[in-house]
């Protein structure tokens, strides 16, 4: 069992009706227009005359209201704070929850060293503002020693008071509780992804997932290498056989304890480090392959979140964990393995390992007869070629694929529905086994990978595959509520889909 000490993953969030005396900074929103910026009014929480004076000062120092632009000015004597931070919201006509979320995140990133901030962004959208501040303030500093750790002036904001007209109202409290739980789940997934492979290998990942599940009241099952061998999980074992750090399969189950509750299966790729194996990757950028368990991190966080929210849906996460390494014991191009369930596969490329571990897990997940199955993985470089670093690709059964993509776009993770062209399926045929793990060409790699997984999804299951090869990890500068490193995508998509299933079946 992991002995790692938990640390706060974000600021303390609280509701407030007025700007308190202990607040250091007031954060307000600023929209842009052809006539100049305008303050997004705080529903009477801040005196309108005060806001007018603030706007005059902001215009004088060049604030424009451009999305995510931040401008900090001294506070007037009429406000009980030291300074005011205006964050751009962009065009008022185009303002939506995701822009509020991103602007709140941008504000949080600039509040280093602040003890307590209050904000009027919560009047515009309480949930989005709460999520944005919590996620924008997230930092991963676990491996900074005392000599390089951030000083007090670089610490993230410790507390954010979200101003609303009725802070004691049940609706406000429920909204904040949900948003805080979602932000914590996203941060948990980020924490897993950001932890280096020296410290998060399959056994350790399994221990941490088990600890999270146990603490959340979930049913937990962990299969070690002996159990995997006994039960015929050839994909997971094949990928993991080159590493001295042996593979695991973790299952976390949440029961709504409700008769005829919908059943949702989640599957996430958990390659704790991916060298490519014998088909080794180029050295440049390989350090980012610490993120190759981003799908697993997301599904672990999501099933725990479903339990925390008490959703009336049964949710089970099946999580294969392995390290893909080259060695004298590693699988070779040309080897044949047997996936869980009996399908034989010719391994043409050992760097197409994610689909091998996912296939085992999908077959196992389908043995529970779920109504819906969502798998997610940092699966293909082709996803980034087709859609870039911020847009997940969604494939699967048509209706459910479109439903997942629509919900993802609504909540700001912006997944895009993609096809699975039937003509690509024959390119996965093998001359010596049931399937090959890759095609013999480079075209449509993301789509072909989904077609491979489709072979293992049981008939009648509504299925969506979310490829997050780019979106799971931000290797560039921060933006909105997203810092460098793990992003937590697609936790918010998956929990929103599960909530939609709870509401509509």
From Swiss-Prot:
Location(s), subcellular: Cytoplasm
The enzyme's E.C. designation: 3.4.11.1, 3.4.11.10
InterPro entries: Leucine_aapep/pepB (IPR011356), Macro_dom-like (IPR043472), Peptidase_M17_C (IPR000819), Peptidase_M17_leu_NH2_pept (IPR023042), Peptidase_M17_N (IPR008283)
Entries under Pfam families matching the protein: Peptidase_M17, Peptidase_M17_N
Organism from which the protein derives: Rhodococcus opacus (strain B4)
Record: residues binding Mn(2+) 1: 274, 351, 353
Keywords, sorted A to Z: Aminopeptidase, Cytoplasm, Hydrolase, Manganese, Metal-binding, Protease
Any GO CC annotation of this UniProt entry: cytoplasm
The keyword Manganese is annotated on this UniProt entry: yes
Reported cofactor(s): Mn(2+)
Function: Presumably involved in the processing and regular turnover of intracellular proteins. Catalyzes the removal of unsubstituted N-terminal amino acids from various peptides.
Cofactor: record remark: Binds 2 manganese ions per subunit.
Chief location bin: cytoplasm
Annotated catalytic residues: 281, 355
Catalytic activity: Release of an N-terminal amino acid, Xaa-|-Yaa-, in which Xaa is preferably Leu, but may be other amino acids including Pro although not Arg or Lys, and Yaa may be Pro. Amino acid amides and methyl esters are also readily hydrolyzed, but rates on arylamides are exceedingly low; Release of an N-terminal amino acid, preferentially leucine, but not glutamic or aspartic acids
Name assigned to this protein: Probable cytosol aminopeptidase
GO terms under biological process: proteolysis
Name of the top EC class for this enzyme: hydrolase
One GO MF term attached to the UniProt entry: manganese ion binding
Taxonomic superkingdom: Bacteria
Annotated residues for binding of Mn(2+) 2: 269, 274, 292, 353
